[in-house]
């Protein structure tokens, strides 16, 4: 696994590695260099979600060993290389869609983007959602991911 993991560092652009480092650091709540079940619990809790231990354990089992940054990169490298990015994006939005409506409150999404991770500015927010499918304050993330990935598919 170490060979595969170190190969990831040479495959990904530096900017992407830096973005992944920021994501890893955000998830690694106790800053010990590893993502464990407690880190995941805290992260999801800060997002207003409470997945059970079984779900969290399943996530962690994707790694063949302790989930340090190199392993984190290794696991996500295929997704980052574009193999299933539309699905990955849709799934990321779906994590916040507890009722599975395929739509999210646009103000909630904006709040997350302003206050978590990269902390979008008002201008970045305006540009991101300029063409976004928003009706009645609801952001249609399935249409949005199809639109930005160019598949033209409206349904999963």
Curated annotation (Swiss-Prot):
Coiled coil: none annotated. Gene3D superfamilies: EF-hand. Keywords: Calcium, Metal-binding, Motor protein, Muscle protein, Myosin, Repeat. Residues 15-50, 84-119 form the EF-hand domain. GO terms for molecular function: calcium ion binding. In molluscan muscle, calcium regulation is associated with myosin rather than with actin. Muscle myosin contains two types of light chains: the catalytic light chain, essential for ATPase activity, and the regulatory light chain, a calcium-binding protein responsible for Ca(2+) dependent binding and Ca(2+) dependent Mg-ATPase activity. Smooth muscle myosin from the scallop adductor muscle contains two kinds of RLC proteins, A and B. The calcium affinity of the smooth muscle RLC is approximately 10 times that of the RLC of striated muscle. This is Myosin regulatory light chain B, smooth adductor muscle. It comes from Mizuhopecten yessoensis.
């Amino acid at each position: 696994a170490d060979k595969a993991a170190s190969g990831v560092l040479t495959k990904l652009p530096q900017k992407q590695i830096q973005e992944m480092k920021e994501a890893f650091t955000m998830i690694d709540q106790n800053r010990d260099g590893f993502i464990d079940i407690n880190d995941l619990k805290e992260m999801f809790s800060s997002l207003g979600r409470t997945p059970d231990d079984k779900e969290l354990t399943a996530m962690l089992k994707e790694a063949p060993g302790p989930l340090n940054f190199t392993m984190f990169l290794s696991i996500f490298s295929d997704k980052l290389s574009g193999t299933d990015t539309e699905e990955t994006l849709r799934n990321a939005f779906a994590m916040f869609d507890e009722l599975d409506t395929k739509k999210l409150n646009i103000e909630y999404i904006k709040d997350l983007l302003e206050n978590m991770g990269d902390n979008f500015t008002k201008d970045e927010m305006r540009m991101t959602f300029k063409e976004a499918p928003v009706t009645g304050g609801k952001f249609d993330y399935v249409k949005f991911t199809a639109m930005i990935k160019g598949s033209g598919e409206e349904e999963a």
